[in-house]
Amino acid sequence: MTRKYFGTDGIRGTVGQSPITPDFALRLAHAVGRVLRRTQERPTVLIGKDTRISGYMLESALESGFNSAGVDVVLLGPLPTPGVAYLTRAQRASLGVVISASHNPYPDNGIKFFSAQGTKLPDAWEEEVEAALEQPPVWADSASLGKTRRLDDAAGRYIEFCKSTFANDLTLRGLKIVVDAAHGAAYHIAPKVFHELGAEVLAIGCAPDGLNINHQVGATHPDALVRAVRANHADYGIALDGDADRVQMVDAAGRLFNGDELLYVMVAARLARDEHVPGVVGTLMTNMAVEEALQRRGVKFMRAKVGDRYVLEELQRQHWLLGGEGSGHLLALDRHTTGDGLISALQVLQACVRSGKTLAQLLADVPLFPQVLLNVRLNPGQDWKTNPVLADAIRDAEAELGAHGRVLVRASGTEPLLRVMVEAREAEQANRCAQRIADAARAG
């Protein structure tokens, strides 16, 4: 079944344009509520959000929609996406709802859902909700309407959960860490997590005004973090995105480390402690150098489709624990049910503290292959798959690279973009091939 509203990470778009409107949010919540009530007499849902100004409007609309379907609501306020996932499970709620467009700018927003177990829901559930949206509403009678309350200590509960994933015998004392929360959902949480574990913390990107989320800060704009680490002679820098489910890190020299590298550090740390790591799941975008390095250490590597939900599905199929994406969505399923930027950063810092090595030293034998990623904006109705010029350009690039590189061309699941990725042993070759493919896509 083709889904009308749900993309790879919930429902997302520009605020005020369908489907990110208050009337749709109310209808959506009502439809979800009806689906929940098919199996539960009195469901409870948790609603968290990031710091976009539109979050207030969408939160109110969702609350009304759920209440009108006979569903109780617990408001969490600004909270990272993984924090909502954790509290949904900890509070024994029926469902978790996150209002966020993750790394997108403030004019965008989105709505995504977590199961009672704190995991992202399968396509089949989203299809059931879309089918319910096509039916006329059935309002609960007055005696059956849902109620709403606020969980005032949601942030504190999540802070303690994050800290519990860091080894009790270790501390961050003596480390100076710059924390960039992207003016997003972790602005009041991330600095406290690292401070309470002993670090000296310098916070940037922690002053949201409703309009500045992800603006020139955070995991998608790490230049500000690099500058702050160098200027303040910090040991590490940690950049989250708007909903804090992804992370990038910087060392004392100002070198940036992406999710592929951080995933390798997490795996290597377990191997160093003689823990069994049978396999790791990456994506079609994961750097070949990481795959080769893991295989040299006897760790199987599998590629899932791009998107942390697909990494999670493959991990569950294989009964493995570790996976992630270069964007910084990292999964350690014995620590959390979903990708968590804060917990991932803590796992990496734990590896550094325990080994006495820097990130650069831990990654000395994993030099990444040059990887070029270009975004080509698609026109409405443009079918890139039937573009013969593009097909020829892709075929030519693959022939040139042979076994020493990769080409991946795919449509974004959240924006009207065609993503072109080329990986090669030489940067100049990767750039040249990627540019040829992007030019061919624009010509179509």
Curated annotation (Swiss-Prot):
It is an enzyme of class 5 (isomerase). Binds 1 Mg(2+) ion per subunit. InterPro entries: A-D-PHexomutase_a/b/a-I, A-D-PHexomutase_a/b/a-I/II/III, A-D-PHexomutase_a/b/a-II, A-D-PHexomutase_a/b/a-III, A-D-PHexomutase_C, A-D-PHexomutase_C_sf, A-D-PHexomutase_CS, Alpha-D-phosphohexomutase_SF. GO terms for cellular component: cytosol. It catalyses: alpha-D-glucosamine 1-phosphate = D-glucosamine 6-phosphate. Activated by phosphorylation. The active site is at S102. Signal peptide: none annotated. GO terms for molecular function: magnesium ion binding; phosphoglucosamine mutase activity; phosphomannomutase activity. Belongs to the phosphohexose mutase family. This is Phosphoglucosamine mutase. It comes from Acidovorax ebreus (strain TPSY). The gene is glmM.
